[in-house]
Regions:
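Short glycine/serine/threonine-rich phosphate/pyrophosphate-binding segments
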Residues: 1
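Active-site-lining helix/loop region of Rossmann-like oxidoreductase modules
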Residues: 4-138, 163, 168
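C-terminal helical cap and adjacent loop that interface with cofactors, partners, or active-site loops
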Residues: 127-202
């Protein structure tokens, strides 16, 4: 959604790249398991093949939403899931990966329009990324007129960001007309510092 908002000051958009580099360290055992933290490379590859590893979920939906907002028709979507292998032992509160094993997953996804790559999603996530010099952050690059780029360092904390978004959208969801809605249908998210009841339409 942030990429869509940034495109509002552009007269044309040629491509969109969204990259989120984040730490899995704050998350619990369920996330460690679904991201393959601590697995051997062979076990990780087997999990990708049999579908037991979730990795990041939502690239197809994000690509679809960006395309819909910009008026593009995606004719092909691809997604990849690769292990991030650590060269040092890494330990987080709920995860451990010894050197040579998997510390996280690098998810990538692409949306093509008329055979041309238009939407590029990149999402490496791992425990204790700083131990090998990786700094977290959220990055958006829009190519077009004018070019637009955005960087947030360090990353927006995934847990806090999710909780805040859900709470801040409460009055907008209440005010929405009945039906299935996406974030494109609702007002731009914002922190609500006042009384939410004042925002409910009578």
């Amino acid at each position: 959604l942030l990429a869509v908002c940034l495109s509002g000051c552009m007269t044309d958009v040629q491509s969109v790249q969204c990259r989120r580099v984040n730490s899995l360290s704050p998350f619990g055992p369920a996330v460690m398991e679904e991201q393959g933290v601590g697995l051997s490379i062979k076990a990780f590859e087997q999990g990708v093949e049999d579908g037991s590893l979730a990795g990041h979920v939502g690239f197809a939906e994000s690509v679809g939403m960006i395309a819909e907002a910009l008026g593009w028709k995606v004719d092909k979507f691809e997604q990849q899931m690769k292990p991030i292998v650590t060269t040092v032992d890494r330990k987080s509160p709920y995860g451990f990966a010894k050197a040579g094993d998997v510390a996280g997953v690098n998810m990538t996804g692409q949306g093509y329009v008329n055979g041309e790559l238009k939407i590029d999603m990149i999402h490496p996530q791992q425990i204790e990324p700083e131990m090998e010099g990786t700094h977290t952050g959220d990055y958006i690059v829009l190519k077009g007129t004018p070019n637009v780029s955005m960087a947030i360092n360090p990353e927006v904390d995934g847990g806090i960001g999710t909780i805040a978004m859900m709470v801040n959208m409460i009055p907008h969801v209440i005010n929405a007309r009945p039906g299935l809605k996406t974030m494109l249908d609702l007002p731009v998210p914002r922190a609500i510092m006042g009384d939410m009841r004042d925002m409910i339409e009578k």
